[in-house]
């Protein structure tokens, strides 16, 4: 920013002013992100305008969202990236604590628990599960989730799961990965919605819910594979 001002012949701000401005900018951006994820979760991504987000962020200038994010897709990407960074950090910690020969349940735990731990730490209420479930099923925004899902920790988990399931044909393994993703996203979104509405949920804690999801996914991954007669499948 200062380089641009000098090139244009402008004077540098007084000492300390730039740092203060940067700090305010970070705070404003964070306020926008927090307001956006709440409104997206409660009302739907496509139903919420930048003006509504700016107002919910407590900004008098309701066009402020456009200053920080060029489009709604950019805002959605920032939210997905922000949450995934926290999940990946927690996942890396779990991977680092694995034993010498982790099994299927160990890798499934590394997949599920970090996601739910972040939701537990954030509330109640929390909004990210409902937001992520919406984006993951939106035709125009789903690619953002797919692009931002790739991380070293996630690849290690998927490799670990595959290593525990050598008997599964590759197409079946990939299909069950997709099923696992939908189960995690949708079950967490439903649980988050119920908690936000003040309903009782079972199990009561996110950790217990994560353990239940691991049970389900391990059962799915180890389920029998029914052979498909390709000749009977019509295009």
Residues covered by each model-derived region:
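C-terminal peripheral helix-coil segments that are non-catalytic and often amphipathic
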Residues: 1-11, 151-235
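An amphipathic alpha-helix adjacent to DNA-recognition modules
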Residues: 29-34, 68-92, 96
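Short hydrophobic clusters on alpha-helical segments that form packing/core surfaces
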Residues: 32-40, 217
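Helix-turn-helix
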Residues: 39-42, 46-74, 78
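Residue-level detector of well-ordered alpha-helical segments, enriched
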Residues: 79, 107, 111, 124-131, ...
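Hydrophobic alpha-helical connector segments
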Residues: 91-128, 177
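Amphipathic alpha-helical packing segments from all-alpha helical-bundle domains
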Residues: 106-109, 124-128, 139-165
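Short alpha-helical scaffolding segments that buttress acidic/His motifs in well-ordered protein cores
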Residues: 111, 115, 129-136, 180, ...
């Amino acid at each position: 920013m200062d380089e641009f001002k000098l090139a244009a012949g402008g004077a540098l701000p007084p000492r300390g002013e730039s740092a203060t401005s940067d700090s305010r900018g970070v705070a404003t951006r964070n306020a926008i992100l927090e307001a956006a994820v709440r409104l997206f979760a409660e009302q739907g991504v496509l139903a919420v305008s930048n003006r509504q987000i700016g107002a919910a962020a407590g900004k008098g200038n309701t066009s402020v969202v456009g200053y920080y994010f060029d489009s709604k897709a950019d805002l959605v990407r920032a939210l997905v990236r922000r949450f995934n960074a926290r999940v990946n950090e927690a996942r890396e910690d779990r991977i680092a604590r694995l034993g010498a020969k982790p099994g299927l349940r160990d890798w499934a735990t590394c997949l599920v628990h970090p996601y739910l731990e972040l939701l537990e730490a954030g509330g109640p209420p929390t909004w990210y599960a409902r937001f992520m479930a919406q984006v993951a099923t939106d035709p125009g925004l789903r690619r953002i989730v797919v692009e931002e899902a790739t991380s070293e920790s996630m690849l290690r988990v998927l490799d670990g799961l595959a290593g525990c399931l050598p008997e599964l044909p590759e197409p079946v393994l990939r299909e069950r990965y997709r099923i696992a993703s939908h189960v995690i996203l949708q079950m967490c979104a439903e649980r988050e919605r119920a908690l936000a509405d003040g309903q009782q949920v079972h199990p009561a804690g996110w950790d217990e819910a994560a353990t239940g999801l691991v049970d389900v996914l391990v059962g799915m991954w180890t389920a029998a594979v029914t052979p498909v007669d390709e000749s009977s499948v019509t295009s």
